[in-house]
From Swiss-Prot:
This is one of the proteins that binds to the 5S RNA in the ribosome where it forms part of the central protuberance. One of its GO terms (biological process) is translation. GO terms for molecular function: 5S rRNA binding; structural constituent of ribosome. The keyword rRNA-binding applies. Belongs to the bacterial ribosomal protein bL25 family. CTC subfamily. Pfam families: Ribosomal_L25p, Ribosomal_TL5_C. Keywords: Ribonucleoprotein, Ribosomal protein, RNA-binding, rRNA-binding. This is Large ribosomal subunit protein bL25.
Length: 187
């Protein structure tokens, strides 16, 4: 499988001041760890990473000092006001490793006429091989009638994937549309 390659610079400075200067220069401070390797503190190009981060559970080839390693973005710290990435935690992985991650759900279709679908959870936790991580799991609500509930156990998973979320975790429910009642005007 082909993954985007990101050139990373080894990071020598630490602390809030260094991180601010790095972000001002268009770099994102990050750390990669796992696979019984020493943590590697790096700087990543902000523009390239913001494009890669549009996908959930993004995998990429991290190129540090002429050696490439496959990494999974584990945690993203964002500045909510300026909507910028402040820091990334990444996990070194092999394609055949099994990882437990939260996979987003994509809802398709429309429920039966006269009903409304209420989404209770937008992701589920699953364990699967790194090479099989989907961008999203599809939940089809087409033609569901009032009173129907969709649980985590109802979601179709990729081959070899195991559901970690509780099987009875409510994902969505279909309820009848409530009609507005006309109230008599006050006297």
């Amino acid at each position: 499988m082909v993954y985007p390659v990101v050139e990373a610079e080894s990071r020598v400075g630490f602390g809030k001041g260094f991180a601010r200067r790095a972000r001002a220069a268009g770099k994102i401070p990050a750390v990669a760890y796992g696979l019984k390797r020493a943590p590697e503190h790096v700087l990543l190009p902000a523009a390239q990473m913001s494009l890669i981060m549009r996908r959930a559970n993004a995998l990429l080839q991290l190129k540090i000092d002429a050696r490439e390693s496959l990494v999974l973005i584990k945690q993203v710290q964002r500045d909510r006001i300026r909507n910028i990435i402040e820091h990334l935690d990444m996990l070194f992985v092999n394609e055949d490793d099994a990882v437990t991650i939260r996979v987003p759900l994509r809802f398709v279709g429309q429920s039966y006429a006269g009903t409304v679908t209420s989404v209770e959870n937008y992701s589920v936790a699953v364990t699967l091989q790194v090479s099989q991580i989907p961008e999203a799991l599809v939940v089809d609500v087409s033609g569901l009638q009032a009173g129907r509930r969709i649980f985590a156990s109802d979601i179709a998973l990729p081959d070899g994937a195991l559901l970690v979320s509780p099987p009875r975790l409510l994902i969505a429910k279909v309820d009848p549309v409530r009609r507005a009642t006309q109230e008599s005007p006050p006297d």
